[in-house]
Amino acid sequence: MATTATPATNQGWPEDFGFRLGGSGPCFVLEVAKGSSAHAGGLRPGDQILEVEGLAVGGLSRERLVRLARRCPRVPPSLGVLPAPDGGPGPGSGPAAPTTVLRAPRCGRGLALGRELLRLAGRKRPDAVHRERRRKAQEFSRKVDEILGDQPTAKEQVFAALKQFAAEQRVDDLVWTLTLALPREACGPLLDNLRIFIPKKHRARFDEVVSQGLLGKLCRARRAQGAQRLRRSRSEERPERLLVSTRASAPPRRPDEPPPRRASLLVGGLAGPGGARRTVRVYKGNKSFGFTLRGHGPVWIESVLPGSPADNAALKSGDRILFLNGLDMRNCSHDKVVSMLQGSGAMPTLVVEEGLVPFASDSDSLDSPNPSSALTSLQWVAEILPSSIRVQGRTFSQQLEHLLTPPERYGVCRALESFFQHRNIDTLIVDVYPVLDTPAKQVLWQFIYQLLTYEEQELCQEKIACFLGYTAMTAEPEPELDLESEPTPEPQPRSSLRASSMCRRSLRSQGLEAGLSCGPSECPEMPLPLIPGERQAGDGTSLPETPNPKMMSAVYAELESRLNSSFKGKMGTVSKSRASPPGPSPAVTTGPRTLSGVSWPSERLLPSPCYHPLCSGGLASPSSSESHPYASLDSSRAPSPQPGPGPICPDSPPSPDPTRPPSRRKLFTFSHPVRSRDTDRFLDVLSEQLGPRVTIVDDFLTPENDYEEMSFHDDQGSFVTNERSSASDCISSSEEGSSLTYSSISDHIPPPPLSPPPPPPLPFHDAKPSSRSSDGSRGPAQALAKPLTQLSHPVPPPPPPPLPPPVPCAPPMLSRGLGHRRSETSHMSVKRLRWEQVENSEGTIWGQLGEDSDYDKLSDMVKYLDLELHFGTQKPAKPVPGPEPFRKKEVVEILSHKKAYNTSILLAHLKLSPAELRQVLMSMEPRRLEPAHLAQLLLFAPDADEEQRYQAFREAPGRLSEPDQFVLQMLSVPEYKTRLRSLHFQATLQEKTEEIRGSLECLRQASLELKNSRKLAKILEFVLAMGNYLNDGQPKTNKTTGFKINFLTELNSTKTVDGKSTFLHILAKSLSQHFPELLGFAQDLPTVPLAAKVNQRALTSDLADLHGTISEIQDACQSISPSSEDKFAMVMSSFLETAQPALRALDGLQREAMEELGKALAFFGEDSKATTSEAFFGIFAEFMSKFERALSDLQAGEGLRSSGMVSPLAW
């Protein structure tokens, strides 16, 4: 049978070649004409077309496949087919039964209908593997739909976890998230089907996590999470952290009342984080969305037109628009959302939330069977800030994961999400503040501030500053006393919260709760007990110095009650062993301990001889070792000591003159923080602002930390308060962890109030060192004392007396070792050890020190080691210099100071005397001096003015300085500078000529490569064709025949419609499909990137300098007469004879390079006079670099698709 002749082109493919195609991806051969070229090539009906010219076309429709084959340069194009089974597709539009039975031996080899060909002739079929994995992914998606069909939130979490795993490749996180989202009975089957999507390098870890029972542990941890919070170092977790508090305007509720339910009513229905969120892409093209919007902040969809793009995207009435193309739309007005939607492009992406979802309280969520599954749905809150905002090198989401446990992260994200709806600062502080209970966690406040408006930032800072800025109110003076009022402290700036210690876990006594719950008329009669470290709870509007019970915010009262209830159980047993000197108080009259009351401004304060910081109800402040503001700036005045019910202490100072203001003593106690630059800057700034009124004394050491006391003295001296502490305080303090305090250079330190000049300080009478204060606060009284020896020798508390005895000002017992301490005024400051403290010493070697009685002996021993002499910071007195025995010799200096200094250094490096250097210059021996030394001698040579001054110098040379003597001797050499330049030129000529020759050769070779590159010319032709196609229909109807080559650097600036790629990506993709041989065009241009770095002007200038130096040397050879001593003319003439041929060769190479460069510029249509070589070659170098990067992006995308990593969005 005769064979039909093969056509000359592919324009009639496939009919001209004797076969027909059908199908819509993949395509099948429907019919093959006998005797045609297709029949002769082995093509049979039913064959599936998989490849055309090596390109995978299994997913292309018939029209696209035909278009691709007709553009192939080879005639006919090579095809890769999958042989048909026993039957082929019929003449329908899609795959059908085959018309012919071919290749029956396959059945005998085990091939059956429906099998997928994965390997053909020893080669893997990536597209077949890809389809196999895609089918398994679809099966997995169907199983998820079957199990989680009624749980859309859990289903969304599963796919979000898979998408996150595809990006981060973390198996443990994947298993953790799936465990939280999936029911326990569904974990096993779904994880088995999920294993195929795990890369091989991670499957071992995946199997280990599943097989070794870690999955069961995660399930158990999830079930127990609602009942017991994870314990973190240095903080007691409180289960009520996640409970939603009442608003600031709500009245305080009793502890036995259940927490109220919150509801936030929006226009579109009830809003809440419980609504199911989903991401929707609307393919609208040039059409409208097809929905109507209502409301604002956020807007919601009122109605959707049937058949519209919104209806096709499954949007429905009641959906609220939260994000548009990644932009937050939740707080935008209606008009702004409409304008943003109009400019959102052809395929905008929306994040919507279903409407009509009840807003459940946090307590309900804790009792739900799957409380932690909401953590993944709240992940968008952690990722709302851009990754460019970082603190300590981490983003917001990274800091949340690094600092907080999963329940804590849930609480913070849930609080922020709720805040976005109600915008209530008080509720945000109450919800977030108990979680951020350590200095390390308080870094998160800097991120939270980024989510607030400027007004909300200022309000939040005022609220927190008032809430944290406790000032002990021991007395409020009567108006008739006419006392001098204290200035109001300035509010902290915005950045002051960045590093201040916010941990204020204080205990609120029953008196405070009673004062908050009482009516306005009862409050003046109810004294307010204070404990160390407690602050007045204000609403942010009243000053902390004058608390008003009518303006107390219930939000902060509730927060105080939370913190109070969380510590009663823990500290109850510890407080029983604490003994403190009781004192008289009108508030409480029974019990071994007396409560000191703080009266309201309308109440007269009862005088007392001494002042003690007392604990409420016998409870020790748990924050004594954790919370710490740097300074407690007490603005209240201490009342003068007057005779009271008890005897007057013998050591107390006499009462001051009633006509003068009562004396006071301000005590600033600083807990020694961890070593950091911020800490040092804080102390420096504080010392500068406080000036001479502050005295920094490293006075003593406690088992936990060292302190610095800063004390102010009035004319009347100071009052010292002491309290005996038991060993239980030290133990409880060490268990709580060391105080981590931070400061910032931007923190504002208010200056101290004006006071009379300080008199000579009074010595302390048997004063004990202050312990670590609760919240760093001090009233006029001295802080609690903790002797070192009480760690191992606790003092049992005395039995409670029937009536409180008088309080002595100085306890009779003194800790051993501390009694021998010098007075604080004469104590020498010592250097501090910059160590980092162990946060939790329990179970370590440091936790065992308290059990060893030898530690007390060591603590006493170090007091006698004279450490102050070795590490004292006081500078020794400088000895008075005696009279000079001889007057300094006066010298004459002519050189500038800089030149003289550098000349002295150079003489030390030369290792040549001036006479030897003169001999070198006269004999012109280049080997005796290095080129660098010659260049320095030229640089430091005298200028014309200095040469005239040397010539006018008529005195003895010995009166000159050493550099001037050297220069004076060098100037006696004829043509001193010319000789130096000649020697330097002779030493560096070879290096310069090689450098210039290489640059010129690079320009010449790069010009030739650009002119002769056919691949580059083909690419430019392809770009021209693409541009003319895009510009067709523009006002200029004539097609462009050429373009300026600088357009090549702008190809990546033209974006595609979806914004994901550029014109350069499309160019690279098209070349890889149609002209793959052109992809390596950069290999034809290896010299072009090097030529782009050559500066043509500098090159021309260097050549001109060489010619100028040679002319100068020639003139010097004629002017300097040769002699037996001076060999300049003879040496340099001989040198010029060998140097001039090399320069002539350079001149010829320069002419040739410039000629080739001009031809290349003209070849590409550029002006040779206006275009420099570096600009010309730089265009092509930049195009090559960008093209390689675009090609790498395409290949990386192809690699991900061929490796089977199917995105969950494609399912």
From Swiss-Prot:
Ranges where the record places region Disordered: 226-269, 478-502, 525-549, 568-600, 618-672, 718-783
Cellular-component GO terms for this entry: cerebellar granule cell to Purkinje cell synapse; parallel fiber to Purkinje cell synapse; postsynaptic density, intracellular component; postsynaptic membrane
Annotated Pro residues bias: 640-661, 749-763
Biased composition (Low complexity): 242-251, 618-639, 725-746, 770-781
Keywords: Cell membrane, Membrane, Phosphoprotein, Postsynaptic cell membrane, Repeat, Synapse
Superkingdom in the source lineage: Eukaryota
GO biological process, one term: regulation of postsynaptic membrane neurotransmitter receptor levels
Function: Postsynaptic scaffolding protein at the parallel fiber-Purkinje cell synapse, where it may serve to link GRID2 with actin cytoskeleton and various signaling molecules.
Protein name: Delphilin
Naturally occurring in which organism (per UniProt): Homo sapiens
